[in-house]
Amino acid sequence: MNERTQRERDRSTGGYPPREALADAWDEHSRYVGFAAGLFAIGILIGIALMAAGYNLLEIIEEMVGEPLFPDIGGQSRTELARFLLVNNTRAFLLSILGALTLGLLTAWAMVFNGIIVGNLGAFIASNDGIGFILVGLLPHGIFELPALFIAAGVGFRLLYRVGQRLRGSRDAILTKRYFYRTGLLVLVGWLLLVVAAVVEAFVTPALLEALFAA
């Protein structure tokens, strides 16, 4: 009996262990998570292209709104920085899910826009400090933060698709207890990745940059 068949049998007999529910949630959402990652990648390419054309988006946005896109966090302790990063990223995480209420437009825009900013900023920093600096500065926390945001966006896109299925009559209900359960577990895993990302960005990334690139 393969793993999927075993999960189906467990569900039919009333059992739904968290591990199996999480596996089902990933099976259900993985395509949409991949779609979100693809939108982000497109944004990165756009951001790099804009920097290559001479457009520094951080400077442009700062001139438009009259203040920096990113607040000054230099005076914060590591713990305060981790808390700030977690709160800020949790907002983006929740907005990516709730973007389903905008027919997915907000979710899609968040993925593309964040990709553009990362690509543009990364290209700028790499041109000044080298590709090694940007890799050390982004990868340690990015390997946790980006999958978390992609999961949130994937949940938003999948929810929108379920609404479409209900409208077409191919699904009896948009939301069910099992859907809430398994998707809630996936969302929890995604948020926990944000917690790890915030800690790494606040404590590990600065130490690595100082150790490897301090003058």
Features from the language model and the residues they span:
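Hydrophobic core segments of alpha-helical transmembrane domains in multi-pass membrane transport
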Residues: 35-49, 190, 195-198
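Alpha-helical transmembrane segments and their helix-start/interface "positive-inside/aromatic belt" motifs
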Residues: 23-42, 180, 184-188
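Transmembrane alpha-helix/helix-exit interface in multi-pass inner-membrane proteins
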Residues: 52, 100-121
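Cytosolic juxtamembrane amphipathic/interface segments immediately preceding
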Residues: 12-32, 95-96, 171-179
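Interfacial loop/helix-cap signal at membrane boundaries in integral membrane proteins
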Residues: 62-95, 117-118, 123-134
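Terminal transmembrane helical module of multi-pass membrane proteins
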Residues: 154-215
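Interfacial/capping segments of alpha-helical transmembrane domains
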Residues: 44-71, 112
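Hydrophobic alpha-helical transmembrane segments and immediately flanking/interface helices
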Residues: 59, 106-116, 202-215
